[in-house]
C-alpha cells in the first residue's frame, strides 16, 4: 500500500530519522525535513540517515536525511528545508527581522501543505 499524504518532520536528528524510516516502511512517499543543524561527529552512530562523511563535510541534517532517503528508495519525494527560528522570548536584532518573517511564513506554508506534522526536536 502506498500513501500519498505528505509528511513534515521538524527535526532530522535521531528521532526524525527513525520516524522517516518507519514512515517509508509503511508506504509514505513524500517526506519533508526541517532542521537548521549540521551533522556532527557524534551523530552517525545514533542517526540512521547520516554517515561519518556527512559530519566531515558539515552537511546539513535535513539535506543529509532527505538525500539518504532517496538513496534508500529512489521513488520517494524527500525534501529538506534549513531555517532557524529563535525560541519564544529570545531577542533578535532588527537586521534579523526580515529573515525571521520569511522563515515563519515558510513554516506556515509547509504546515498548510502537509497532512501530517511530526515535532521531533
Regions found by a protein language model. Name each.
Residues 1-121:
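Adenine nucleotide-associated cytosolic modules
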Amino acid at each position: 500500500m502506498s500513501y500519498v499524504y505528505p509528511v513534515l518532520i521538524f527535526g532530522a536528528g535521531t528521532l526524525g530519522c527513525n520516524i522517516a524510516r518507519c514512515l517509508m516502511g509503511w508506504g509514505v512517499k513524500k517526506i519533508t525535513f526541517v532542521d537548521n543543524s549540521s551533522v556532527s561527529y557524534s551523530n552517525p552512530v545514533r542517526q540512521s540517515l547520516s554517515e561519518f562523511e556527512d559530519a566531515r563535510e558539515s552537511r546539513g541534517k535535513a539535506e543529509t536525511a532527505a538525500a539518504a532517503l532517496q538513496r534508500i528508495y529512489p521513488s520517494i519525494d524527500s525534501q529538506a528545508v534549513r531555517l532557524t527560528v529563535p525560541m519564544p522570548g529570545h531577542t533578535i536584532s532588527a537586521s534579523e527581522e526580515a529573515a525571521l518573517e520569511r522563515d515563519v511564513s515558510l513554516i506556515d506554508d509547509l504546515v498548510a501543505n502537509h497532512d501530517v506534522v511530526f515535532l521531533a526536536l
